[in-house]
Amino acid sequence: MNILADALLPGLDSAFPPPFTVTLYHKADEIPELLHHKDVLLCRSTLKINGDLLKHHQIKVVATATSGTDHIDFPFLESQNISIIDAKGCNATSVADYVVACLAYLDKQQLIQGKTAGIIGLGQVGTKVYERLNAAEFQLCLYDPPKATRDTSFQSCSLEDLLECDFLCVHAELHSNAPYPSLNLINRDFLKELKPGCIIINASRGGIINEEALLHLGSAILYCTDVYNNEPHIDNRIVSRATLCTPHIAGHSLEAKFAAVAIVSRKLHQMLGLPYPQFATPEKPYRLNDDSNWRELALSIYNPIHETLELKHAGNLSSAFLTLRKNHHHRHDFTTYFDSDSIKKYPLLG
């Protein structure tokens, strides 16, 4: 079976041994020519999967090595009987680390007013964030009405409850499905009711927050974001407005990238009735001593202000966004730096 895969994905050789043959693409404009006689397209969330890309090809499977699937035109793929494989949950730990790093920076700058936190979206990422904040004894408001309809043991708070929070963590999937669409969920009416000094950390998708409404709100609300409308052609006004702004890398730890490929590989092998291969894993980093506080430990591993300043000072914002995202490849999950005793001491770290 012939696979065309994004060259930036790690561990492809071990994840797809014979009978698979892997060809790599480095840029999206290489795909139309390389896709001939391929059975599987293995991509990342940066590639739009639709009829324009695939209409002249006869592939059988689209596999995305990412949790999010809003870059995929599902109706088109279904109309062509093309199977879809995703890697949901692959980067949940990495995104939770990112949120903690943002909180570490904000707390160090004395910008966090209290310990009441709202989490929007309780999928695998939101649940990871919840577990850490709960272990660190934050007061939590959990907003996920669709989850409440599926899981009778879960009770969602209301949007009004979120207005009392000191900070909000956004982890919902982007969709427009009634009765609880996430598209433009955080709009002008919601934003203007937040208490002054409230912090929003968006590590989901740009379209959940109405960027125009945010821009017209003034500076009372602090905005920290990893995601934007129209990536990579992001709005320079949002970058200027944001306290922290990073190039969509929250889920880009080395462990998350390897896990994404492994999850896709397992699903494809299972689909074809093949035994699982041995998967490559990233080399473990050196251990850190826990003789500092949680803020310094988190920021010693990843400090979001560095990429924030790179974006804010960029001449060509789109180019800087893509370059920074591509070069973000040395971060490990926080838990790989500590033993279990250190994690018990500082539960926000893992």
From Swiss-Prot:
Cited InterPro entries: D-isomer_2-hydroxyacid_DH, D-isomer_2_OHA_DH_cat_dom, D-isomer_DH_CS, D-isomer_DH_CS1, D-isomer_DH_NAD-bd, Erythronate-4-P_DHase, NAD(P)-bd_dom_sf
Pathway assignment: Cofactor biosynthesis; pyridoxine 5'-phosphate biosynthesis; pyridoxine 5'-phosphate from D-erythrose 4-phosphate: step 2/5
Binding site for substrate: 45, 66
One MF term in the entry's GO annotations: NAD binding
The protein's role, per its UniProt record: Catalyzes the oxidation of erythronate-4-phosphate to 3-hydroxy-2-oxo-4-phosphonooxybutanoate.
Family indicated by similarity: Belongs to the D-isomer specific 2-hydroxyacid dehydrogenase family. PdxB subfamily.
Protein name: Erythronate-4-phosphate dehydrogenase
Taxonomic path: Bacteria, Pseudomonadati, Pseudomonadota, Gammaproteobacteria, Legionellales
